[in-house]
Amino acid sequence: MTFLLGAGTIGIDVTVSRALACSVAVKANRPRGLTRMFVGRQPEEAPVLAGQVFSLCGFAQSVAARLAVLAAADLAMNDEERLGASAGLLAERIFETLRALILQWPTPLPERFAADAGRHLREALAASLAIISHAKAGRTSRPRLAAAAERLSAAATALGIPGRGDTPLPETACAAILRDVEDDHVFAGRRPDPLTISDDAEVVARLRDEAGYASLPHLSGRIAETGAYARSASAGLPEAPHLARRLRARIGDVRISLTQLTALARTGDFDCASLACSGPTPGAGGYGAVECARGRLYHQIEIGGDGRLAAYRILAPTEWNFHPAGPFVETLLSSPVGADEAAVRSISRLAVLFDPCVAFEINVREAADA
């Protein structure tokens, strides 16, 4: 079974024995070498190119690139640019989370929700794109932002995002998805080991110094995770089924992001460190890190003696979560997933809630057939 998202795929091969996942192999088949197209260009070209190359979270990619370029020059965003960047990051995070939940959920929505969900998603997309386009043009104003944020909030509410907490509103698409997993006890609960700003120094140093780190990142003695579940304080609650906790974390993340976006429009003041940060790196370099829908995204650059980009590195959130020895594999391994289509259904739910940025393919086989 294949779920389409974007370029490349993640292969998930699971061997089951007596209905338990006894072996899990995850292999990414993604286009490599994309960062080579940045090398040799002027640093100021990187943000625009990053936003064009990546179809998902393009604004987050652009902001991470911009932060890295500024950090390499020992510069920072001014207040106006920071306002636009924060607004755009929040808007994109809200829409991308909603889009992935509604469109990628493996169980079809009940007919009474499906048509309305599509309409509300289109409204959310239009509001998000309005905020992002104003940010790109440097024309973010608080009144304009407030109007777009209200429109985005209305669409999210219609899809089930609550005003408080993480329980979806009744008779909505998100409530239907929660019903699909609220009694699913296939996967045991696990507390996430969040990737945070405190890890940036080590991550960026390894990204710069270790070949292949961008595709197989690691932190010694840890199984680091990034994204809504890792960001959520409620992720440690043990009583709810694991899939329901992951879903609630994403619903809660959208609610929090909407609250932050509304406050930003009202006051113009926001602690950007919770969304994005940057710093210099050796060799006339810099990095930018942003918290996007799927987790923490890194861009790291080096500028050569000719003033052009001499090196460019990107580390995406999916590489942490779907690492061959990462949190997705740890959660899946030894779980009673069943066999055949039942196993595919359970694994696909888990994969969607880990939210990869590319398609995934699931293959399940019995140990006797391996």
From Swiss-Prot:
Matches recorded under InterPro entries: Ni-dep_hyd_lsu, NiFe-Hase_large, NiFe/NiFeSe_hydrgnase_LSU
Q: What Gene Ontology molecular-function terms does this entry list?
A: nickel cation binding
Q: Where is the signal peptide?
A: none
Entry-linked SUPFAM superfamilies:
HydB/Nqo4-like
Highest taxon in the source lineage: Bacteria
PANTHER family according to UniProt: HYDROGENASE EXPRESSION_FORMATION PROTEIN HUPK (PTHR42958:SF4), HYDROGENASE-2 LARGE CHAIN (PTHR42958)
Name the family the entry cites: Belongs to the HupK family.
Q: What is this protein called?
A: Hydrogenase expression/formation protein HupK
Species name: Rhizobium leguminosarum bv. viciae
> Gene encoding this polypeptide?
hupK
